[in-house]
């Protein structure tokens, strides 16, 4: 199919953001997809822990996911994303750290982080309800996650307001402990920032920067206009590309922080400020990505494969 699209010179672009099977991402297939106009692919990994993958009967393996990522990194014109979930029944902090470490080793463009919210009546829902991870509710009361920012509106409405120092947020949680629902929300937020936004400080590939600008414009204008991180890092990328930032974008961020205690707390915790955009002066110490949930440098996951 891809070769025929190319042969006919249809001059179109397409994406597979609903998800592809990792094992199908071979050099031959992805090269043909890119040539035919593919601009985005999403891999539905969910977890980077072997035990969790087995428990949810996920057909993909860590080898599949890392192999697919290696292929996709060779095709920079494809914006490659990964779907991650936290909050599986019995999932410990150590298992979540496995997911974070595999995601980091994949080193792709975006991670769609979400908390597991199963449908009532399913085995996984019953298991989570029995463990107290979720409360049994009627269908009308069940909250669905709208993606990477699906929780933000819920948090900001006062249903979840975490104000802890996020740089030390998980230091006192035992690695063999199953996080509480409140802790899971903090973990979800923290993962989303460090796997997606913080790494933008280190991006210098022009193709990837353009992809991120397009992605953040959609987030800031359509999907989650209230999200302060989207506005801040859109401004940062504008600065890298042109040496300036539009006054309108600066005003949007100032308005967001002025009206939202939630975002003021988060920006303070992560060392971010609207003044960075106004002064065109960003943190100078952003040279290495922060380690998550561990003070020790984790060995590459691939070192333990096979």
Predicted regions and their residues:
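A structural motif corresponding to the C-terminal lobe/cap of the Radical SAM core domain
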Residues: 6-222, 244-258, 275-288
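TPR/TPR-like alpha-solenoid helical repeat scaffolds
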Residues: 263-304
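"A position-specific structural signal for the A-helix of alpha-solenoid helical repeats
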Residues: 85, 233, 266-270
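Catalytic-core helical/loop segments in enzymes performing group transfer/polymerization on anionic/lipid-linked
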Residues: 227-228, 234, 254-257
């Amino acid at each position: 199919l891809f070769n025929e699209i190319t042969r006919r010179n249809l001059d179109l672009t397409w994406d597979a953001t609903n998800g592809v099977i990792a094992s199908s991402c071979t050099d031959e297939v992805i090269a043909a997809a890119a040539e035919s106009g593919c601009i985005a692919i999403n891999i539905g990994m969910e977890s980077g822990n072997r035990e969790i993958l087995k428990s949810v009967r996920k057909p993909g393996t860590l080898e599949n996911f890392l192999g697919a990522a290696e292929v996709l990194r060779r095709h920079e014109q494809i914006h490659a994303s990964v779907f991650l979930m936290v909050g599986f029944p019995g999932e410990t902090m150590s298992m979540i750290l496995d997911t974070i470490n595999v995601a980091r080793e994949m080193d792709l463009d975006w991670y769609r982080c979400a908390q597991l919210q199963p449908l009532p009546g399913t085995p996984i829902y019953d298991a989570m309800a029995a463990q107290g991870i979720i409360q049994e509710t009627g269908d009308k009361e069940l909250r669905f996650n709208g993606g990477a920012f699906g929780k933000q509106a819920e948090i900001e409405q006062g249903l979840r307001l975490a104000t802890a120092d996020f740089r030390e947020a998980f230091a006192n949680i035992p690695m063999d402990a199953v996080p509480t629902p409140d802790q899971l929300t903090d973990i979800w937020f923290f993962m989303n920032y460090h796997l997606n936004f913080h790494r933008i400080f280190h991006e210098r590939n022009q193709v990837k920067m353009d992809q991120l600008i397009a992605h953040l414009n959609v987030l800031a204008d359509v999907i989650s206009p209230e999200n302060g991180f989207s506005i801040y890092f859109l401004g940062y990328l504008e600065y890298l590309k042109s040496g300036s930032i539009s006054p309108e974008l600066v005003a949007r961020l100032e308005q967001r922080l002025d009206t939202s205690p939630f975002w003021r707390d988060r920006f303070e915790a992560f060392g971010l400020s609207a003044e960075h955009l106004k002064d065109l002066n960003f943190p100078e110490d952003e040279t290495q990505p922060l380690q998550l949930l561990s003070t020790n440098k984790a060995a590459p996951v691939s070192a333990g494969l096979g």
